[in-house]
Structure formats: C-alpha cells, structure tokens
Regions:
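Transmembrane alpha-helical segments in integral membrane proteins
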Residues: 19-24, 117-140, 169-176
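Alpha-helical transmembrane segments in multi-pass membrane proteins
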Residues: 1-125, 215
Length: 264
C-alpha cells in the first residue's frame, strides 16, 4: 500500500473525529441562537449529521481512498465492467441485473450472517434482561442524560443507517491501514469509544453521559455489529441487522426519554 494512500485514510479519519468534536462544541451555541434561526432545525442540523455519518465515507469511496470492500460494500467492485451490464441498455433491466449480481455475491455469507444475527440477538437479550433484574433488585436508577445533537428515535431506520455506515467507515479505514480485519474491527471500535469519550468530556459531564443507559445500548450495538462484521464484512446485510438489534434493545429497555434521543 502506498504511503500517500495511508495518509489519505488517516486524514479522513482524523477529519471525521474533529468534525464530530467541533459539532459537539458548537451545539450549545447553536441551541442558544436556535430561536433566531428556526431553519437550522429543518436543514442545518440534519445536514451536519449527513456530512458526518455519510459524507466522509462517501468521499473516501468516491475519491478511491478506501476500496468498497473495506466498507463492507460486497459486490460493488464486481459491477464495474461486468459483461452482463454492458449488453443491456434499459434502466429497469440494468437495475434488475445489478441487484441479481449483488445478491449472488452475498449468497456464501447468508448462512453465517443469519447464525451470527441470532447469536447476537440472544446475547443482547440475556444481557439486558439481567441488567433489568439487577437494577430492579438494587432499586437504583443509573444516570440518564440527553446528548447534544440528538438524532431522533433509536429505532428510526435512518438513524441506524447513519450509524452502520459510519462505524463501518472507521472499521474499514483501520482495516485498510493495518491490512488485518481483526485489527480493523477492534481499532474501529476503539476509535468510536475514544470519540464518544471526547464528546462527553467536551460536554462537561463525561461520567453522566458514559454511564447512561443510552450509551450502554450504543456500546452493546457497537460490539454486536463489530462481531458480525468480523465474520461477515458485508454492510448491505449489516444495516438491517443493526436496525433489528436496536429495536430489540429498545424493547428490552423501556426507559426515560433519553433513549428516544440516541445519536448513534
């Protein structure tokens, strides 16, 4: 791998983290002045979320800094120059062939993907069931907090797509740098945890945010999806699993409104 390619990926990862930190830092200022600029809630804030979660991964992919397979976009690279696509002209027919080629490339992964999905769902169910009983028996309530820049319901599909794509971007970037999938998965998770910690520190309440049930659910989803990505590095299949696991966690942990404001 050329050194300049390594530095490109490093630059994208650092820029993404700095963008998130800058957004967190600016959030209190924005909230104070939100009444003067109501259009911010309808355009500005969603635009920043899109740039952070989707913009950086897409730019790295578009400019060739990060190959598609490292993002988990299995089958995408095979579409370029595919003879089946070069012989058809109709848009509908090209779309049908494209979907067929993608599905064909996923077939070997469907078995492990289904097994890991069931396993992770079982582990999360057991973990959160035990947690609920432990909390009920102690009579205590862990701290809740609302994270600046919250992004809607935890079960919202758009929120899950954002998280799945961006987490895969961090995993894929470090996978590309290290040329080791295990290091990519572990390093990507570590980078996300560091980013969360820095955001909590900038907010001035690190312990409260990092021990909230919202953050615990985020961490559980991160670990579960990282394990699935290690064995089945396919973002197409990971996105619906991410959403289903998030709905499962939300069902198992009915809690105050901080869970309805998760930004993952």
């Amino acid at each position: 791998m050329a050194m300049d390619a390594r530095w490109q990926i490093i630059a994208y990862l650092i820029a993404s983290v700095l963008f998130r930190l800058a957004s967190e830092r600016l959030d209190p200022f924005i909230k104070v002045h939100i009444s003067r600029h109501p259009a911010w809630m309808n355009f500005g804030s969603p635009f920043l979320r899109f740039v952070y979660h989707i913009g950086f991964p897409y730019l790295a992919l578009l400019l060739g800094a990060l190959p598609a397979r490292y993002l988990g976009l299995v089958g995408l690279e095979q579409l370029y120059g595919a003879p089946e696509l070069s012989t058809v002209s109709g848009m509908v027919e090209r779309m049908r062939i494209t979907i067929a080629l993608l599905l064909r490339s996923w077939l070997p992964q469907l078995g492990p993907w289904a097994s890991l999905t069931i396993l992770m769902a079982g582990l999360l169910t057991a973990t959160w069931t035990l947690y609920r009983y432990a909390r009920r028996s102690t009579g205590g309530n862990p701290p809740f907090s609302s994270m600046p820049g919250s992004a809607g319901d935890v079960t919202a599909f758009s929120t899950m797509v954002y998280a799945a794509v961006h987490w895969s971007f961090y995993r894929g970037g470090i996978w590309w740098l290290s040329d080791d999938l295990y290091l990519g998965v572990a390093g990507g998770a570590a980078l996300i945890f560091v980013e969360w910690g820095l955001c909590a520190w900038l907010a001035g309440r690190p312990l409260q945010q990092l021990t909230s049930e919202r953050t615990l659910i985020e961490a559980g989803l991160l670990i579960a999806t990282a394990a699935i990505f290690y064995y089945v590095p396919n973002l197409w299949l990971l996105i619906p699993v991410h959403w289903l696991l998030a709905r499962l966690c939300r069902y198992l942990m009915p809690a105050p409104l901080d869970l309805a404001d998760m930004d993952i």
